[in-house]
């Protein structure tokens, strides 16, 4: 009954207004209030500040500065080897596996469309049909920068306005098409395993999604899907390099072509992921 009420609340809640208001608060330089909120957040979610480059809550001028905090250089090691892909984030695997008949598994009784996830264009979705996916949830305590699993040249980006449902196991099990209806940014790279898509999915209280090449992404006045073509620009990011960040967090969906990679043997739904550790290996074709 409580779970049902929570889901009903998700539909009734003014999610975009709430996200805008909290986004403004998170961006405000509010002095002692900012420090107070950061300390409360650290205690509530058991955030490990020993890994942060700056561990003193008073160092951060805004809550966003704290939330997107940088790690110490030695805090994460990126797995070596050209054929090894690295975990792009700290988080936990929500679901992973094969893309079957153009659909990705969300939770028991729910799947969603690859085409819709990527903005509705067949040419964008086609390279990933019958491919593989991994959906990784970033909890409040996690490090909220997203890094490259493999060296890649940026080919295109798509920003898709949408809803801002909370993303967690409860909503995944009860909100149809959750990841294909929430606001999201899609970045597609050419890599040694073929095209790789990194989908950054927004959620309630996610004030913004940023990329290192375009900055903060926002919906235009008409709430239309926006496209950027980078094929003629040399924007190449090395494995382990930062590619984006959430100002307040959500989920990353990584997409790969058919027979391009094998996920790490110990990886499954529920697995904790740690930036830089083995995510997958390239399939060698004879």
UniProtKB/Swiss-Prot annotation:
Gene Ontology biological-process entries: phosphatidylethanolamine biosynthetic process
Family: Belongs to the phosphatidylserine decarboxylase family. PSD-B subfamily. Prokaryotic type I sub-subfamily.
Pathway terms, separated by semicolons: Phospholipid metabolism; phosphatidylethanolamine biosynthesis; phosphatidylethanolamine from CDP-diacylglycerol: step 2/2
Any one GO molecular function term: phosphatidylserine decarboxylase activity
Free-text cofactor note: Binds 1 pyruvoyl group covalently per subunit.
Complex formation: Heterodimer of a large membrane-associated beta subunit and a small pyruvoyl-containing alpha subunit.
Chief location of this protein within or outside the cell: membrane
Name of the gene encoding the protein in the UniProt record: psd
Biological role stated in the UniProt entry: Catalyzes the formation of phosphatidylethanolamine (PtdEtn) from phosphatidylserine (PtdSer).
Keyword set includes Secreted: no
Keyword match Oxidoreductase: no
InterPro entries: PS_Dcarbxylase, PSD-B, PSD_type1_pro
Any one GO cellular component localisation term in the record: plasma membrane
Modification after translation: Is synthesized initially as an inactive proenzyme. Formation of the active enzyme involves a self-maturation process in which the active site pyruvoyl group is generated from an internal serine residue via an autocatalytic post-translational modification. Two non-identical subunits are generated from the proenzyme in this reaction, and the pyruvate is formed at the N-terminus of the alpha chain, which is derived from the carboxyl end of the proenzyme.
E.C. numbers: 4.1.1.65
Keywords: Cell membrane, Decarboxylase, Lipid biosynthesis, Lipid metabolism, Lyase, Membrane, Phospholipid biosynthesis, Phospholipid metabolism, Pyruvate, Zymogen
Bilayer topology: Peripheral membrane protein
Subcellular location per the Swiss-Prot or TrEMBL entry: Cell membrane
Pyruvic acid (Ser) modifications at: 250
Cleavage (non-hydrolytic), annotated site positions: 249-250
Name of protein: Phosphatidylserine decarboxylase proenzyme
Names of the cofactor(s): pyruvate
EC category name: lyase
Catalytic reaction list: a 1,2-diacyl-sn-glycero-3-phospho-L-serine + H(+) = a 1,2-diacyl-sn-glycero-3-phosphoethanolamine + CO2
Active site annotation, chain numbering: 90, 147, 250
């Amino acid at each position: 009954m409580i779970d049902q009420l929570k889901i009903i609340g998700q539909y009734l809640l003014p999610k975009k207004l709430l996200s805008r208001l909290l986004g403004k608060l998170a961006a405000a330089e509010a002095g002692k209030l900012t420090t107070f909120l950061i300390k409360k957040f650290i205690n509530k979610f058991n955030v490990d500040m020993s890994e942060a480059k700056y561990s003193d809550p008073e160092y951060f001028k805004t809550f966003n500065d704290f939330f997107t905090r940088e790690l110490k250089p030695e805090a994460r090691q990126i797995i070596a080897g050209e054929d090894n892909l690295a975990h792009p984030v700290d988080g936990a695997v929500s679901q992973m596996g094969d893309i079957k008949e153009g659909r990705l598994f969300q939770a028991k009784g729910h799947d969603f469309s690859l085409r819709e996830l990527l903005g509705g264009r067949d040419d964008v979705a086609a390279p990933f049909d019958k491919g593989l996916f991994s959906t990784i949830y970033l909890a409040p305590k996690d490090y909220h920068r997203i890094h490259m699993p493999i060296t890649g040249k940026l080919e295109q980006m798509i920003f898709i306005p949408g809803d801002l449902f909370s993303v967690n196991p409860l909503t995944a099990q009860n909100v149809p098409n959750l990841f294909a209806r929430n606001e999201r940014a899609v970045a597609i790279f050419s890599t040694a395993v073929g095209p790789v898509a990194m989908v950054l999915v927004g959620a309630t209280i996610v004030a913004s999604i940023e990329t290192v090449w375009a900055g903060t992404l926002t919906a235009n006045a008409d709430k239309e899907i926006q496209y950027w073509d980078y094929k003629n620009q040399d924007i190449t990011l090395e494995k382990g390099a930062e590619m984006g960040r959430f100002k307040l967090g959500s989920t990353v969906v990584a997409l790969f072509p058919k027979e391009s990679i094998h996920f790490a043997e110990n990886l499954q739904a529920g697995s904790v992921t740690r930036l830089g550790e083995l995510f997958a290996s390239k399939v060698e074709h004879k």
